């Protein structure tokens, strides 16, 4: 007998599946009754029965129904994941739900979409920039059309757009002034043309010097080069004339480059020779271009007043602020110019008589027959140096040098004040002039020459060159040869006919009282950083040289600091120089080259130490030996009696109150 299952029992094959699905039921409801209640509840809610609620099918439909959208997403993902794990754990299916679940760089569609999006974004940015540029172009074209009355062809038109009509603004028509266009400096225009022509000429010269050219081409290039050179010379000439015709610069602003350098033919004699005149009375000076605040100095001793600081006046500026004016004496090759420069205050010596020798004008004795006049110094000589030696000066021309002119300063050291710069070292200038410069109180001595010395690596002197530094092995040569007695000339600027001897200097301390100028060689002592107004004249102190007749007197001489010497005048200026023998010229040239060779090996490291220099001399030439000591220790001496040959026999020393006689 067959057994039928009970209604409230679950078939044995379905119980495990219901438990596996884990669907909750109300307690007490089992079997078909529970299924019917669940179906009825879903139908009353208005929803269709879900496909997976059927007992016979557990597969998801290929096409979801109306109830699929209301299904919770968690349930959908759980079902999809459950099936994928059953089919393959390593592969994710994209056919269950019809939605691509893959994303990121592994997806074959995503990089292309991203690239397309970036390109579209860049295109939109470029289009916006192009539109802005076109708008700016339209605005500029409209402004131009308002000025000219015509719309430019560059005006951008949109598709189907017509060109706008623009009317010119009132007052927009005008003409530019030619003067406003060409009001630039003509000098600058000429300079630019000259610079361009220099380059063109250089290019033409290089083309002419090229190799492997035919005769015709070489001739043409040479002709072109000559034409360009002519144009260059014409431009240079026009530029020089234009500069000359332009407004002249003030006298105080002369270019210093020319004053700070000396050429190879520089020598001290350019500043030594004074212009000769038939009469002793100088001509009245013409109108001076100097400012009216600088009065001209008087030309006679009677009109001169002692220069010094005024009472209650503030201290003046240092000496370096006073300008130096070029004079006609600096151009010996030119004819005397009728200008006020030689007699202006900046170039004329300021002299003042004194009653007697002061403490700063100490005269040191030496048994020689020469007088001294200080050397003319040039402001800026402590700045400029050159390396070439100077041309030697012929002795015949030196014998006719009557005096040296010292560059003047407008006030002495008391009025000008001490320089703010530290002193480097004292400087000695040894100068000798013939007796023809002085009144004929006694017959002129036969050995008269003009010698000077300075320390300059490029501007040498006429007779005495560089001394050697302490520790230097290179001696320096100094020479002095006797000459024939020069003719007596009267020169302006050296000695005035006022009954007293006037030293051509710029400071009252350099003057001597009437009748007090004993014949002999003197040493000009100067501080290099100081103006020439603070120079002092000294004579060498008596020493062991008086014990022997043949022993030359030693001099105290310190190295000058960068003295600037000007050119040597031509031999054609000196009538006596034309008859010089070739032997004399060769001798001078030989000693000049010897000095240049020795100076090239001399170390310059001791130039700033104020060291005393010792010089060795050849036979037959006068020389200067070792310094006797600081100038503060040199006593003042007076010659009481001389021998017939001019040597001092009896000397009085005021400091010690002694009379020294030579036996």
UniProtKB/Swiss-Prot annotation:
Sequence motif Nuclear localization signal (NLS) 2, residues: 332-338
UniProtKB keywords: Coiled coil, Cytoplasm, Disease variant, Immunity, Innate immunity, Nucleus
Job description of the protein: Expressed in peripheral macrophages and intestinal myeloid-derived cells, is required for optimal PRR (pattern recognition receptor)-induced signaling, cytokine secretion, and bacterial clearance. Upon stimulation of a broad range of PRRs (pattern recognition receptor) such as NOD2 or TLR2, TLR3, TLR4, TLR5, TLR7 and TLR9, associates with YWHAQ/14-3-3T, which in turn leads to the recruitment and activation of MAP kinases and NF-kappa-B signaling complexes that amplifies PRR-induced downstream signals and cytokine secretion.
Residue interval(s) of motif Nuclear localization signal (NLS) 1: 164-170
A single BP term in Gene Ontology: positive regulation of cytokine production involved in immune response
Protein name: Innate immunity activator protein
Intervals of motif Nuclear localization signal (NLS) 3: 422-428
InterPro entries (UniProt xref): CCDC120/INAVA, CUPID
Biased composition regions of type Basic and acidic residues, renumbered to the chain: 327-340
A cellular component annotation (GO) from this entry: nucleus
Gene that encodes the chain: INAVA
Location of the protein in the cell: Nucleus; Cytoplasm
Stimuli inducing this protein: Expression is induced by the component of peptidoglycan muramyl dipeptide. Negatively regulated by microRNA-24 (miR-24).
Organism name: Homo sapiens
Disordered, as annotated region: 1-68, 242-362, 378-425, 444-493
Domain of life: Eukaryota
